[in-house]
């Protein structure tokens, strides 16, 4: 019996559409003429050069299904070879049924399927679930899918009072991603820790218009409050790594959530991570939400940055606030 799990494949679907930081600012000026927006603000504030945009007709499930289909083709697997499909994303086609069923139908899968949601930590929590289900013998192959269309949460009509919580919405990206987790005779997912600071949940909100109609609608992110919500989580993560006898500087690859370049730089400095250990995805893709971590893994595979036996760490950070660290042996 294979008592462990490992990530065996990572795939991504990046739409060809792009919107530059300059184009974002031009559109914002058209819709919010009262703002005296200084040129270059988006790039200076976030480090964004351009973001990925899906075709208007594409839904989150379409992006997820394309990444999943690509993964199955690369792995030379049939739909019948998958035991369980998980969908984990901020974005969604529907509230009912689970979006995983839509992705399964589009990829020809007939296995059980369900959604996992934890803001931008959805995929790393899906890895947690897949690892547990495989270790307990309930499944052998779990396909994790993600489809993000965060560009559609852009708030174009802003005034000075709403600029602080609305500007971040203009950095969201459209990305599809997929990971395959399989039973293994040797450890692949070697350890993980999950953390939370739930009293800070108001820092970033996207209220449901049907069930919370009296609340502010649209994506609202107080960047300062969100950054403060992670205070203490980084220290707990560092302490856990110390207990695992892991020196971050000795890792071959570090994947970290990338909501902005300044955020990545600040997190890297606090965790003593070398810039060369991180693949920067934000500047030319944007904030890919839950697809950010699999995007970096897929990019590392594409660039041949990963070899069998390499030590990898995934750092998840999400509104809520929640934090996670997962250690992998590739």
Language model features: what each stretch is:
Residues 35-44, 94-108, 146-158, 208-211, ...:
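Acidic-glycine-rich active-site phosphate/pyrophosphate-binding loop
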Residues 67-83, 235-252, 300, 304-305:
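Phosphate/pyrophosphate-binding loops at sites that engage ATP/ADP/AMP, CoA/4′-phosphopantetheine
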Residues 208-254:
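Oxyanion-binding "anion nests"
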Residues 61, 65, 91-92, 102-105, ...:
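Claisen-condensing/thiolase-fold acyl-transfer catalytic domains that form or cleave C-C bonds
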Residues 135-173:
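Flexible, glycine-rich active-site loops centered on histidine and acidic residues
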């Amino acid at each position: 019996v294979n008592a462990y799990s490992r990530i065996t494949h990572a795939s991504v679907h990046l739409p060809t559409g792009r919107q530059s930081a300059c184009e974002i600012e031009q559109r914002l000026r058209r819709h919010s003429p009262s703002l005296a927006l200084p040129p270059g603000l988006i790039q200076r504030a976030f480090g964004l050069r351009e973001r990925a945009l899906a075709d208007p007709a594409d839904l989150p499930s379409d992006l997820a299904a394309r990444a999943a289909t690509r993964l199955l083709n690369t792995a030379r697997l049939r739909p019948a070879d998958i035991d369980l499909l998980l969908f984990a994303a901020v974005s969604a086609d529907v509230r009912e049924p689970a979006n995983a069923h839509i992705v399964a139908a589009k990829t020809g899968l007939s296995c059980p399927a369900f959604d996992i949601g934890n803001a931008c930590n959805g995929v790393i929590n899906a890895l947690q679930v897949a690892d547990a289900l495989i270790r307990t013998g309930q499944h052998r192959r779990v396909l994790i899918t993600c489809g993000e269309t965060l560009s559609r949460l852009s708030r174009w009509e802003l005034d000075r009072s709403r600029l602080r919580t609305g500007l971040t919405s203009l950095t969201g990206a459209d990305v599809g991603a997929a990971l395959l987790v399989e039973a293994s005779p040797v450890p692949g997912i070697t350890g993980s820790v999950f953390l939370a600071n739930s009293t800070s949940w108001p820092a970033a909100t996207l209220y449901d218009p049907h069930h919370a109609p009296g609340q502010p609608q649209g994506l609202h992110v107080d960047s300062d409050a969100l950054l403060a919500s992670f205070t203490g989580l980084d220290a707990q993560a560092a302490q856990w790594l110390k207990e695992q006898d892991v020196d971050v500087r000795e890792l071959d690859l570090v994947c970290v959530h990338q909501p902005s370049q300044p955020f990545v730089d600040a997190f890297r400095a606090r965790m003593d991570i070398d810039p060369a250990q991180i693949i920067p995805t934000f500047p030319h893709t944007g904030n890919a939400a839950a697809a950010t971590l699999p995007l970096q893994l897929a990019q590392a595979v594409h660039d041949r940055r990963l070899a069998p036996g390499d030590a990898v760490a995934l750092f998840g950070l999400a509104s809520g606030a929640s934090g996670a660290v997962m250690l992998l042996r590739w």
